[in-house]
Amino acid sequence: MAEFYLKILLIGDSSVGKTSLLFRYTDNYFSEEMISTIGVEYKEKVITLNNRKIALQIWDTSGQERFRSITQNFYRGADGVFFVFDVTNKNSFENIKVWLNEPQVVELNSQKILVGNKIDLKEQRVISKEKMEELGVKINLVSFETSAKTGENVEEIFTKIAELILSNKSEDEVKQLYSKDKQNISIVSEESSGTKINKQCCA
């Protein structure tokens, strides 16, 4: 049984590879035919960090505009957020600031990481590592390059965000991470809104 429960969000434009990152991390699975998320996708993975069992409860949110008002309901209580863009898609990179400035995101007291995905597509790449790091400095976020296809840096980003969350909380705040509210996620209101939720768990 996990000692702590951390709620992690994957946020960004549609088709940047958020779902692929989720499945690569939790199931070590990748498919070129991954279907875009409708609503939200939820999976859980238990890791050991500093000799403690930690459950990462990971929410992959749809980047499609028509689901925006629904998926924002899932932002509440997030401990960590990945802002994901596609290094072959300039618009997805430029839209990071849009995602960062969403009111529901601004209100979050959480650790945030900038993620440039699809670095395996070297010939199609339009956003350099230097440009990504420059943005990271401007918006005060740690930045990582990843490839859901090859698995490069995927495990590292999830470990890093867990480390950041725990290192930036007081002892009392860390104790609050062991919460029944985190274990038994309430999704009744979202389900009644017609949001698709896939709940899966893997240790």
For each predicted feature, which ranges?
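Switch I (effector-binding) loop of TRAFAC-class P-loop GTPase G-domains
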Residues: 26-53
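Conserved catalytic network of the ASCE P-loop NTPase/AAA+ motor domain
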Residues: 48-51, 72-77, 104-108
